[in-house]
């Protein structure tokens, strides 16, 4: 860990705990800051706060009192899930208190160069692919960030012989100042999280923060399937390395079924260990990073051929009576489900879809669901999803939850079919998060197998 002095004796408020807040509080204390932690959960029900108090860190729990900001804090480090219109954050900004997320702290102390991956879809899969390729190629890629390992915790233990492979959300990227990856990847940009950001333009601006401090010695990898990425490519100091599945570019691209980097064939798309056009895009981004990092072609091909996916991201679960089950619970928007379906023969797919109703219609999904064997529909958004199914001419059945939907889908399936959980909706109408939803699917499949 780098030895830094800029936070010594600074009064810092950590707003919100969870994994990242707890890690940030401990790191700040280690760096000599005077730390106060504020979390909305009551102290009696808050083991993280109890643990921090035992370590000598001040904690304020059970609410977010605005008067706490009268204590002359010089910095706020907030949980990325807390919005900027939260009264505590808004008041801090009024007082001109800098507001960071923990990835800024991670950058400040990391001895390792950083590869930062962001985007609307494919972040986790691409991040995991990159780390796997680096490790197989002898480069020591260490996962961190939005993938479940707090960056500020992981960054303390890496050395300059490692590479910190960091998944970054738009929420995290709103709270950076000096953060400077050597390689940045933007998988794609679609209109998601507008309820948080207010507009697509603000969302894109948050993502684009990833390259603010990059120079001509750095690389940014952009998806040239999108015109927006081509526009953004003119607005960075970093060297742009494009990838595309629709045209030959000066980077990584798909041509006649082959995956190329700057004219050199590395492997064929049908050799990838995970299905779907979206995973071809993820693989191309990974190839670009790997080639820039000096990984051999053999290591790239071996890794991508054996890569089995990420839990809840088009994850193969099991086969029962020659029926395959795939868990794609992470598909919380229409684009993600479209990409999941692209990897299968619709006539053999029973799709489980539906979830939180955000007022979206699903007409965009009609071409992608046309020809499905059946759909099983659940959740608040069920009436809207059913309208799309009717327009597509797809037969559907109702289910009360994911377990029920999985059982119904299996009853409708024949040998050679695929049962695909790819909801195209967030999970919060029924489940705490998409992981819990996906775990219910996996557990139900296990029970069906007996």
Curated annotation (Swiss-Prot):
Primary location class: cytoplasm
Alphabetically ordered keywords of this record: ATP-binding, Cell cycle, Cell division, Cell shape, Cell wall biogenesis/degradation, Cytoplasm, Ligase, Nucleotide-binding, Peptidoglycan synthesis
Annotated EC: 6.3.2.9
SUPFAM superfamilies xref list: MurCD N-terminal domain (SSF51984), MurD-like peptide ligases, catalytic domain (SSF53623), MurD-like peptide ligases, peptide-binding domain (SSF53244)
Positions of ATP binding: 119-125
Pathway where it operates: Cell wall biogenesis; peptidoglycan biosynthesis
Subcellular location(s) of the protein: Cytoplasm
Keyword Disulfide bond: no
Gene Ontology annotations of biological process type: cell division; cell wall organization; peptidoglycan biosynthetic process; regulation of cell shape
Function: Cell wall formation. Catalyzes the addition of glutamate to the nucleotide precursor UDP-N-acetylmuramoyl-L-alanine (UMA).
NCBIfam families with a match to the protein in the record: murD
PANTHER family in UniProt: UDP-N-ACETYLMURAMOYLALANINE--D-GLUTAMATE LIGASE
Protein family (similarity comment): Belongs to the MurCDEF family.
Name the UniProt record assigns to this protein: UDP-N-acetylmuramoylalanine--D-glutamate ligase
